[in-house]
Amino acid sequence: AVIPLKNQGKCGSCWAFSTVTTVESINQIRTGNLISLSEQQLVDCSKKNHGCKGGYFDRAYQYIIANGGIDTEANYPYKAFQGPCRAAKKVVRIDGCKGVPQCNENALKNAVASQPSVVAIDASSKQFQHYKSGIFTGPCGTKLNHGVVIVGYGKDYWIVRNSWGRHWGEQGYTRMKRVGGCGL
């Protein structure tokens, strides 16, 4: 289960949205509670990342672990710009994170079968940016520059959740060709 789609706006915070989506989902799987968590807290407080200028999933997870948790979206709402880090509740905790070997489709498929998984893709092509529907087959390269979440898969494609709002793609999702598409 995932929270309704969100939109990162003009802030380069895909790393925070992708990380938070997986933590929300893992929390729902473990507790049965689907709670919208704060991307803004990561943008403001994950100092090893770069706020709206980009970041890394592993550093975001490490922030959540070291901080003892992350607050809700309601308590620490998204602003689409980096502000000062402020005190926040620790509503949902994680105790670790595990990577999936790059370019290993079976490992990724096994991970996605048990929970949504964050991945970096090459989203620089105009075709991806203006994607509307169908199985996205490219063109795209392997310059990993955008964080998304794989929430499922079909025979020939991954079901990928983006953070560009419901107007993009298939209600904010895309189906991406499996077998090495866009850096996967």
Curated annotation (Swiss-Prot):
One term of GO molecular function: cysteine-type peptidase activity
CDD domains, sorted: Peptidase_C1A (cd02248)
Alphabetic keyword roster: Disulfide bond, Hydrolase, Protease, Secreted, Thiol protease, Zymogen
Principal localisation: secreted
UniProt keyword Disulfide bond present: yes
BP GO annotations: proteolysis
Compartment(s) where it occurs, according to its Swiss-Prot or TrEMBL record: Secreted
InterPro entries cross-referenced by the UniProt entry: Papain-like_cys_pep_sf (IPR038765), Pept_cys_AS (IPR000169), Pept_his_AS (IPR025660), Peptidase_C1A (IPR013128), Peptidase_C1A_C (IPR000668), Peptidase_C1A_papain-like (IPR039417)
Sequence similarity: Belongs to the peptidase C1 family.
Subunit structure, interactors included: Monomer.
Protein name in UniProt: Ervatamin-A
Species annotation: Tabernaemontana divaricata
